[in-house]
């Protein structure tokens, strides 16, 4: 079967890393990128050099209005570059880009993201949570995808992609009565380098490099959409901390069935080695956040960091590269959708 042809709208952090993941995984073909704010020579520079993930281990050049991305042992990608502000005006069909990654962070509703369909795209994958598009987390509920009705879908958030696989394993084996999640989250582009005004909560606008900033996140509640039996049982919040990448979920839950920490470790390791291989990972090493930069997993369970008050009340810890792990799942979701027609 031929690879899915992919277009990327928005060549920011996630857009560029989706392209890196696509090159590395070699399971889809990127044929177009749209970004009205970046010239093609600047795209080459931004893709080649990355302060967090390092220099691209291949070559990137441009020829006219095409980016050429190549890496030894991988398929090369000849990528048409568009510069349209209006998603409906992007001629995705002209390069047979059937699948569009909507990674601007702007067009996150079904109505807004479906504008890509007017230009010839067949499916749109929003790389963010969506208020109304169905959310799919690879390894958790992606098999519920409905090819005949789901033309615009959401890959949920990076935090939901970390939390949901772990919550599924724990709920399937022991049952979750209720739980609270905290994510200690790396800075993102929405934050301010120094104190400035914020459109949401005032403290969101405080300097990202100077502060630990309490923040809201819908990631835990979103798990209830992905795993319906957990709906209303989880909520959470975030602390934004001054690190550039890699975040960590702390999931504190009450269990229906009592479980020792060894019991929990066994089922998580079995899932990581079995049905969730490549999505969920397991480590007993004395790891810290930088150990997971460019890790392609959604969720890496930290066995040594977990604690238990009693067999029904536990705190579980799982790491994630909030940029690269998530971008890998975007590519995986496209690959799965492509097999469903």
From Swiss-Prot:
<dbReference type="InterPro" id="IPR036291">
    <property type="entry name" value="NAD(P)-bd_dom_sf"/>
</dbReference>
<dbReference type="Pfam" id="PF00044">
    <property type="entry name" value="Gp_dh_N"/>
</dbReference>
<feature type="active site" description="Nucleophile">
    <location>
        <position position="158"/>
    </location>
</feature>
<feature type="binding site">
    <location>
        <position position="35"/>
    </location>
    <ligand>
        <name>NAD(+)</name>
    </ligand>
</feature>
<dbReference type="Pfam" id="PF02800">
    <property type="entry name" value="Gp_dh_C"/>
</dbReference>
<protein>
    <recommendedName>
        <fullName>Glyceraldehyde-3-phosphate dehydrogenase 1</fullName>
        <ecNumber>1.2.1.12</ecNumber>
    </recommendedName>
</protein>
<keyword id="KW-0963">Cytoplasm</keyword>
<dbReference type="GO" id="GO:0051287">
    <property type="term" value="F:NAD binding"/>
</dbReference>
<feature type="site" description="Activates thiol group during catalysis">
    <location>
        <position position="185"/>
    </location>
</feature>
<keyword id="KW-0560">Oxidoreductase</keyword>
<feature type="binding site">
    <location>
        <position position="85"/>
    </location>
    <ligand>
        <name>NAD(+)</name>
    </ligand>
</feature>
<dbReference type="InterPro" id="IPR006424">
    <property type="entry name" value="Glyceraldehyde-3-P_DH_1"/>
</dbReference>
<dbReference type="GO" id="GO:0005829">
    <property type="term" value="C:cytosol"/>
</dbReference>
<dbReference type="InterPro" id="IPR020830">
    <property type="entry name" value="GlycerAld_3-P_DH_AS"/>
</dbReference>
<comment type="subunit">
    <text>Homotetramer.</text>
</comment>
<dbReference type="InterPro" id="IPR020828">
    <property type="entry name" value="GlycerAld_3-P_DH_NAD(P)-bd"/>
</dbReference>
<feature type="binding site">
    <location>
        <begin position="13"/>
        <end position="14"/>
    </location>
    <ligand>
        <name>NAD(+)</name>
    </ligand>
</feature>
<feature type="binding site">
    <location>
        <position position="188"/>
    </location>
    <ligand>
        <name>D-glyceraldehyde 3-phosphate</name>
    </ligand>
</feature>
<feature type="binding site">
    <location>
        <begin position="157"/>
        <end position="159"/>
    </location>
    <ligand>
        <name>D-glyceraldehyde 3-phosphate</name>
    </ligand>
</feature>
<dbReference type="GO" id="GO:0006006">
    <property type="term" value="P:glucose metabolic process"/>
</dbReference>
<keyword id="KW-0520">NAD</keyword>
<dbReference type="GO" id="GO:0006096">
    <property type="term" value="P:glycolytic process"/>
</dbReference>
<feature type="binding site">
    <location>
        <begin position="217"/>
        <end position="218"/>
    </location>
    <ligand>
        <name>D-glyceraldehyde 3-phosphate</name>
    </ligand>
</feature>
<dbReference type="InterPro" id="IPR020831">
    <property type="entry name" value="GlycerAld/Erythrose_P_DH"/>
</dbReference>
<comment type="pathway">
    <text>Carbohydrate degradation; glycolysis; pyruvate from D-glyceraldehyde 3-phosphate: step 1/5.</text>
</comment>
<keyword id="KW-0324">Glycolysis</keyword>
<dbReference type="InterPro" id="IPR020829">
    <property type="entry name" value="GlycerAld_3-P_DH_cat"/>
</dbReference>
<feature type="binding site">
    <location>
        <position position="322"/>
    </location>
    <ligand>
        <name>NAD(+)</name>
    </ligand>
</feature>
<comment type="similarity">
    <text>Belongs to the glyceraldehyde-3-phosphate dehydrogenase family.</text>
</comment>
<feature type="binding site">
    <location>
        <position position="240"/>
    </location>
    <ligand>
        <name>D-glyceraldehyde 3-phosphate</name>
    </ligand>
</feature>
<dbReference type="GO" id="GO:0050661">
    <property type="term" value="F:NADP binding"/>
</dbReference>
<dbReference type="GO" id="GO:0004365">
    <property type="term" value="F:glyceraldehyde-3-phosphate dehydrogenase (NAD+) (phosphorylating) activity"/>
</dbReference>
